[in-house]
Amino acid sequence: MKEGIHPQVHRAKVHCACGESFETTSTRKEIKVDVCSKCHPFFTGKSRTVEVGGRVDRFKKKYGL
């Protein structure tokens, strides 16, 4: 392997939107994610509510049309 061409690997702290955090290795020191194994429906066994309606419906609701 060549010297000096590989990125530095650090212990990275991963922060989820649900408030959970854990450590892993990465080239970044801090990582922010939207979903982790503590809050993802596949791992929790709970289903999420699926938003009914498309973009047009959301636009009309947002602007009162």
Curated annotation (Swiss-Prot):
Zn(2+) binds at C16, C18, C36, C39. It comes from the Bacteria. One of its GO terms (molecular function) is rRNA binding. The keyword Ribonucleoprotein applies. Binds 1 zinc ion per subunit. Keywords: Metal-binding, Ribonucleoprotein, Ribosomal protein, RNA-binding, rRNA-binding, Zinc. One of its GO terms (biological process) is translation. It holds the Pfam family Ribosomal_L31. InterPro entries: Ribosomal_bL28/bL31-like_sf, Ribosomal_bL31, Ribosomal_bL31_A, Ribosomal_bL31_sf. Gene3D superfamilies: Ribosomal protein L31. Its cofactor is Zn(2+). The keyword Transmembrane helix does not apply. GO terms for cellular component: ribonucleoprotein complex; ribosome. PANTHER family: 50S RIBOSOMAL PROTEIN L31, CHLOROPLASTIC (PTHR33280), LARGE RIBOSOMAL SUBUNIT PROTEIN BL31C (PTHR33280:SF1). Part of the 50S ribosomal subunit. Binds the 23S rRNA. NCBIfam families: L31, PRK00019.1, PRK00528.1. Belongs to the bacterial ribosomal protein bL31 family. Type A subfamily. This is Large ribosomal subunit protein bL31. The gene is rpmE.
